[in-house]
Amino acid sequence: MADTNETQPVGVARRDLMIAGAGAVLALGIGSAETAFAQAAATPALAQTVTPGKVAVERRGAVLLVGIDRPLAQNLLDPPILIGLGKAYYELEHDDTLRVAVLHGVGQNFSLGADLPALAVALASGAFPPKDGDFINSFGLRPPFRSKPVVVAVQGGVKYGGHELFLASDIRVAATDTTFSQGEVTRGVFPGGGATIRMTREAGWANAMRYMLTGDEWGAEEARRLGLVQEVVPSGNQLDRAVEIALKVAAAAPLGIRATLASSRQALAGEEVAFAALQAELLRLAQSEDRKEFVRALQERRQPVFQGR
């Protein structure tokens, strides 16, 4: 359930600022605090209007349900949510009674991206990223990696860092009302949470570029056509269907499941070089004049004029 103290809506300008460059902060906030702070610092620190998020965890036999629970803030990903996801994935990995997770978002949207102001504050204070070892990167950007599968159920908005979190799963179910976006290029940065690698691999080069280079949105049926979604179901049924699939996975031989994932990931080992190169490029764009121009334009309520520098 949502936090009852979370009663004030997020203003449009603040929401856009938080969403802008979400992938960059998500990728670096977990892997490199210094670089992530440079990205977050490019967005003005604004007063917080909503309470922190949380992750709701529920066990159903061998299935672990992991819910992003910040609906009144459109499930924007703040440090408590990112830490909660990392700890839930750690629990999945190290509890032998658990075989598969189902990731979902509470409320109207799966997630509209990252809460940049909250991340900037946490990075500056040293509260994020977590320093203990009971944590697995939910974006799969750095080790330790999980060896058990994640099924994701999405609805409403799946955008920016929320879309990259979605792409980091293994099996995907979407409601008919789902809208996807990976539009960081319209905000002076680029997708830094893995979309440039995963979306290109799964949807094909031109299909991925069609959306990542324009910032256009796409729907559930288009996502299925692109191969990013495996099933589209009536709105409201997505979580039940994801759990049904997860139960089938949980009934299979655990060693066989893990071996299948491990073998499949070995075929993608060359992508480690691309993942490793994300941080340097993110830092360069976070400090660019175009990124600063986007923030100024958002504050002045006008269209940005990018100069390519």
Q: Where in this protein do the model-derived segments appear?
A:
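N-terminal secretory signal peptides
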Residues: 1-13
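Conserved CoA-thioester-binding segment of acyl-CoA-metabolizing enzymes
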Residues: 2, 16, 20, 39-106
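Crotonase-fold acyl-CoA enzyme core
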Residues: 11, 56, 79, 141-255, ...
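N-terminal twin-arginine translocation
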Residues: 11-16, 25-43
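C-terminal long alpha-helix characteristic of the crotonase
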Residues: 43, 49, 71, 173-178, ...
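Terminal peptide-recognition signature
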Residues: 66, 70, 85, 103, ...
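An acidic, glycine-rich surface segment that forms the CoA-thioester-binding/catalytic face
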Residues: 82, 86, 90, 94, ...
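Short, active-site-adjacent cap segments at secondary-structure transitions
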Residues: 108-112, 159-160, 264
